[in-house]
A protein has these predicted regions:
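Catalytic-loop of the protein kinase fold
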Residues: 85-92
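Short, glycine/acidic-enriched loop or turn micro-motifs at the edges of active sites
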Residues: 50, 92, 110
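AlphaC helix of the protein kinase catalytic domain
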Residues: 54-63
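C-lobe/activation-segment region of protein kinase-like
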Residues: 103-157
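Hydrophobic/anchoring residues in structured secondary elements
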Residues: 29-32, 92, 97
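Conserved protein kinase catalytic/activation segment
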Residues: 94-106
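Conserved alphaE helix
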Residues: 65-76
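Conserved ATP-binding subdomain of kinase catalytic cores across diverse folds
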Residues: 1-53, 75-83
């Protein structure tokens, strides 16, 4: 195979994240059809997660202290940091508040586990910029998420 298949990236990323306790749907199956050395098709089956995408949630609900979405986002962000991982497409539609109230990461086809600190820091900055663009029309929401990240850092010294 000349390149990494996105389905295989999602499959591997999902297993690694779950191994380290990061909430994400469980990868169930991955099938890659090949013709000689070239890949023809790839299929990925993930566990179904019922819930609400952050993108579709009312902004007031997103920052509702009772749901704890900003604090959970800060936890997901720091869990990725500990793994030196970047999502690659950190938009609100790739975060689901499941029916149990747990914030899950989805759409892992661009996840990277970095070896180089420089590449990691650059991509991490892109992930945060992409996430904050979700709320460009609502500075209050951005402020709440930034505050949650700062509070998380301060709580862990």
């Amino acid at each position: 195979m000349l390149f990494t298949v996105r389905a295989l990236t999602s499959w591997t990323g999902g297993h690694v994240l779950r191994l380290f306790g990061v909430p994400t749907p469980r990868p169930v199956a991955c099938l890659i059809e090949k013709s000689g050395p070239l890949q023809k098709q790839a299929y990925l089956l993930m566990e179904k997660v019922s819930g609400e995408h952050l993108y579709w949630m009312d902004h007031a609900k997103v920052i509702d202290a009772g749901l704890g979405v900003p604090a959970q986002f800060a936890s997901r962000w720091h869990e990725l940091c500990l793994l030196r991982a970047t999502h690659g497409d950190m938009k609100a539609s790739n975060l689901i508040l499941d029916d149990e109230g747990v914030l899950q990461l989805i759409d892992l086809d661009s996840i990277l586990f970095h070896r180089s600190g420089r590449g990691y820091e650059r991509q991490r900055g892109k992930d945060m910029a992409r996430f904050m663009r979700n709320w460009k029309e609502s500075p209050k929401v951005q402020e709440v998420f930034r505050g949650a990240l700062i509070a998380y850092d301060e709580a862990r010294g």
